[in-house]
């Protein structure tokens, strides 16, 4: 079975599950599809452990997988409990490439389809990891940035003249899994650093990883906690950094 066939089968199984009303009320297609993609054995899904429920629990290895699109801070209590006895991998889906499909709300017809200029990168996981300062370097915790391509369907029901601003998203459909970038130890964070001068500022980093100044500041703190970079001084008003030896 090819990767594409594996993903397509996972999505079909997820659609059936959601139609039958199985799973959490707020579960969306992407989350459910990735559960089947990462662990086809349905008996490993949504397993109660203590007062929490693991997205995936692989009994033979004692491994837990949590799929979290955003808001890693909401995982703190659950991770605190799980990490005492199990190894946990937090998988963060990142949209690498997206096609936007606009749907007429009256006819249901797709009236336009275009490629979004925004491209996701593995470094997009860093601002989320920033929310877990006490757990980031825990020996039982791994992170995985899952880069995927999607088609997103939105209703043309927004408030501005072209009906796009404030529009409602109908659903996202995963079309391809590009890669999975794992961080299994603090030393692995260094591999997420882009090409940079020997000495660099946050502004240099923001340009290289294509994040805003604020989110780049969060990423810098993650790299500092991991020991990937160190602050060495200032250049004007900006802090200077270098890679750790």
Name each region found by the language model:
Residues 224-235:
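A short, conserved structural fragment
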Residues 77-139:
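A basic- and aromatic-enriched beta-loop-alpha substructure that forms the phosphate/nucleotide-
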Residues 34, 54-71, 75, 82:
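Conserved catalytic cores of phosphodiester-cleaving nucleases, focusing on short active-site segments
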Residues 234-245:
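Short, cationic-aromatic polyanion-contact patches
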Residues 1-52:
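Acidic-basic catalytic patches of nuclease active cores, encompassing PD-(D/E)XK
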Residues 211-224:
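Short amphipathic alpha-helical interaction segments
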Residues 196-208:
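Short acidic, hydrophobic short linear motifs in intrinsically disordered regions
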Residues 111-181:
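Long, low-complexity, charged/polar intrinsically disordered regions in eukaryotic proteins
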């Amino acid at each position: 079975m090819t990767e594409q066939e594996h993903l397509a089968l996972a999505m079909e199984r997820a659609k059936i599950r959601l139609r039958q009303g199985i799973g959490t009320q707020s579960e969306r297609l992407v989350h459910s599809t990735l559960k089947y993609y990462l662990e086809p054995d349905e008996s490993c899904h949504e397993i109660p452990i203590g007062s929490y429920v693991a997205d995936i629990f692989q009994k033979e290895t004692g491994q837990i997988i949590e799929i979290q699109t955003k808001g890693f801070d909401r995982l703190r209590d659950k991770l605190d409990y799980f990490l005492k006895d199990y190894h946990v991998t937090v998988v963060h889906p990142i949209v690498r490439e997206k096609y936007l499909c606009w749907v007429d709300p009256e006819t249901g017809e797709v009236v336009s389809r275009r490629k979004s200029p925004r491209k996701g990168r593995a470094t997009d996981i860093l601002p989320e990891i920033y929310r877990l300062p006490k757990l980031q370097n825990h020996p039982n915790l791994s992170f995985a940035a899952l880069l995927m391509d999607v088609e997103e369907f939105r209703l043309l029901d927004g408030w501005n003249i072209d009906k796009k601003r404030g529009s409602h998203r109908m659903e996202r459909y995963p079309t391809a899994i590009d890669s999975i970038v794992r961080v299994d130890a603090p030393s692995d964070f260094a591999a997420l650093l882009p090409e940079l001068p020997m000495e660099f500022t946050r502004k240099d980093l923001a340009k290289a990883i294509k994040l805003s100044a604020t989110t780049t500041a969060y990423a810098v703190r993650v790299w500092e906690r991991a020991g990937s970079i160190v602050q060495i001084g200032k250049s004007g008003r900006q802090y200077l950094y270098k890679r750790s030896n």
